[in-house]
Every structure is written in structure tokens, then in C-alpha cells.
Amino acid sequence: MQKVEVFRIPTASPDDISGLATLIDSGKINPAEIVAILGKTEGNGCVNDFTRGFATQSLAMYLAEKLGISREEVVKKVAFIMSGGTEGVMTPHITVFVRKDVQEPAKPGKRLAVGVAFTRDFLPEELGRMEQVNEVARAVKEAMKDAQIDDPRDVHFVQIKCPLLTAERIEDAKRRGKDVVVNDTYKSMAYSRGASALGVALALGEISADKISNEAICHDWNLYSSVASTSAGVELLNDEIIVVGNSTNSASDLVIGHSVMKDAIDADAVRAALKDAGLKFDCCPPAEELAKIVNVLAKAEAASSGTVRGRRNTMLDDSDINHTRSARAVVNAVIASVVGDPMVYVSGGAEHQGPDGGGPIAVIARV
């Protein structure tokens, strides 16, 4: 029987492993039982954000030392998903998922379960296209099996780290006579995120295979997953996948619930996600209920219309600050205003992740 524990740890810098080290040294975390680390790092979240790789390297080197294995073995064992960009009041932090094998009976109902899977490395010309969609769909099903989740309806959040195109990778494709989905390296992040999200939707039966095509990726915004959260980075060539849901094959003291924000200021969806995770309240959650929250995970996106509820904004027109950065700041502030804590995970760029301008939101909470 699996028992999943989740630890949210603030960080003082991308290479700060002190909080994790304290929990390991105190015996609260067995490093051999860590299956995934999800983080928010204080870079720009764009192509040249190397805080993601810096954080991953620092964590992997530390765990390699503690486990007595190589760094290469660590990154094959643990999914490291670092999302850059902590604009506004968002607090840099990591969320550590620990999965134990225990000789305990299952708890009443369904409890938190987590599974991890990795796709193969992608060629540059495969990013943002059906090759990526189909491979991600395969890996999501593998992660569900790893989590012992049988029903797709029990999956509440699928976090993915996916690759992007660089000038070097684009040139590599051209030398081999191949074309890439887009020559703009920043836009390639959107295509990779979008294809990965549609892979989630395909795996979970949210969208049928006949509706997904190369032409639909980053064009048909009616196609989306309600539980996918994808983040692109320069530090990898494959997709790393964490499936989080509830299972009868779990003795965890935690559960996860979710909702979907219809736009960047949808506080009602935040409260709906809290209730789906088991929090009890009428209008506003009281302090004793908020204390049950382990973390909130969400996506943020500027609507393609350039408006929110009919009011114009300039996120898409700002040449100085990319719209994903503004969107992260807004959504983090909305969530923080409801839960009373700015240390929540908000990732920018929600292509095919929730409706246009909105995005999935999930809450992990203690029972």
C-alpha cells in the first residue's frame, strides 16, 4: 500500500537545498522515497531562464550524495519539474512528493496518490506536433499505472516539464533536412506546452484522438485539458510527468481536488477547488480550514482577446514584460487573497490547459 506525503519548502535562492536537508537530517523525509520535486524558481520563466536547471542540478547533486548514486541515476529516479518566474508576491519554493510502501490498510474513501513517468527524448522537429502528443499520452497512462489510479476521473492534476527549441536545436533539424514547428524559440515553449497538454487530454479521454492534429495545436483553443499543467524549459529534451490524484490503493492522510479558473480573476474557482479537496466553509474559508492546505497548484494565461470580463488589458501588448509573467503575478495574487498565503505554485503559459485565459487549479489538503 502506498502512502504519499507532500512537503512545501521555501527557498532563499535557486540552489537552496537547506530546507530539504533539514527535513532529511531530522528523519522526516527518507531521500530514497522521494519520487518528485516540483518547484518555483526566481528566474524570468523564458527561454534563457537558467534558474530551473540550476535548481535541478543543485537538488540532484545533493540527493546523489545522500543516496550514494550518480546524479544521472537520480534524474532517472526522481522527476524534477522546475517552473521559472515568481513575479509579484509569489514565494520561491519547492514541493517534495514522498511515496512510502507501508503495511497499513487503505483509508476510507480515496486518498492522495502520485505516479511518475518519462517520455523518450524528442527530436527538434517533433516538438509541438503529434509525435509529442502521442508520446505524452502514452507516458501519462504509464504514470497513472505507477500511481495505482485506474479511473481517469480520479486524476486531478498532471504536471509536466517539457523541452523547447533553441537556435542550436533548430539548426540541427535544418542540417538534417527537417523543419520545426516554429522558428521563434519563445513561441516554441507554447507549442511544446500545448502539445503536452493535449497529450494529457488524449490519455484521460477528455478529447478524442480524431479531434487533435498538428493544425489544432496552439490554434483551436476549444480543445483543452482540465487537469494538465505544463511548463517548458531549456534544461531537458524529454517530457517529465507527475500524475497526482486520489486512489483506493493509498493510505495517505492527504487528498487532492481541483477546479478550472475561467479567467485570471476567477476567485470562485479557487474556492471550488478548496471545497473539492474537502475544506468545509460557506463564503470564506476560516483559518482552521485553511490550515489543512498543503499547497495550491495552478496555471495562468493572458486571454487571447486581450480582455478580462470585457475590460481591456495590455498584457499581450507589453514589449518589456512577457504576458506569462504578468499572468503569473495576477493569478498568484488572486489565489493568495483567498488562501492567505503567497507561497503557492503558479505556472504561466496555459495553452490547451483550461479555457482561453483561464487554467486548472488543484489543492492538496490534509483530511
Swiss-Prot record:
Region (RU B): 111-248
GO biological process, one term: atrazine catabolic process
Regulation: Inhibited by barbituric acid.
Pfam families: Amido_AtzD_TrzD
Entry keyword Cytoplasm: no
Known pathway: Xenobiotic degradation; atrazine degradation; biuret from cyanurate: step 1/1
Binding of substrate, residues: 52, 83-84, 193, 231-232, 328, 347-348
Keyword Hydrolase: yes
Residues binding Mg(2+): 301, 350, 353-355, 358
Reaction(s) catalysed (UniProt annotation): cyanurate + H2O = 1-carboxybiuret + H(+)
Annotated region described as RU C, given as residue ranges: 254-367
Domain of life: Bacteria
Active-site residues from the entry: 161, 231
EC main group: hydrolase
InterPro entries: AtzD/Barbiturase, AtzD/Barbiturase_RUA, AtzD/Barbiturase_RUB, AtzD/Barbiturase_RUC
Site residues by UniProt (Important for substrate specificity): 324
Entry EC no(s): 3.5.2.15
Molecular function terms, GO-annotated: cyanuric acid amidohydrolase activity; metal ion binding
Entry keyword set: Hydrolase, Magnesium, Metal-binding
Annotated region (RU A), positions in chain: 1-104
Family: Belongs to the cyclic amide hydrolase (CyAH) family.
Purpose: Responsible for the hydrolysis of cyanuric acid, an intermediate formed during catabolism of s-triazine based compounds in herbicides such as atrazine and polymers such as melamine. Catalyzes the hydrolytic opening of the s-triazine ring of cyanuric acid (2,4,6-trihydroxy-s-triazine) to yield carbon dioxide and carboxybiuret, which spontaneously decarboxylates to biuret.
Subunit structure: Homotetramer.
Domain notes: The monomer structure is formed from three repeating units (RUs) that share the same structure as one another. The monomer, the active site and substrate all possess threefold rotational symmetry, to the extent that the active site possesses three potential Ser-Lys catalytic dyads. It is possible that any or all of the three active-site serines may act as nucleophile (albeit only one can do so per catalytic cycle).
Name of the protein in its database record: Cyanuric acid amidohydrolase
Organism: Moorella thermoacetica (strain ATCC 39073 / JCM 9320)
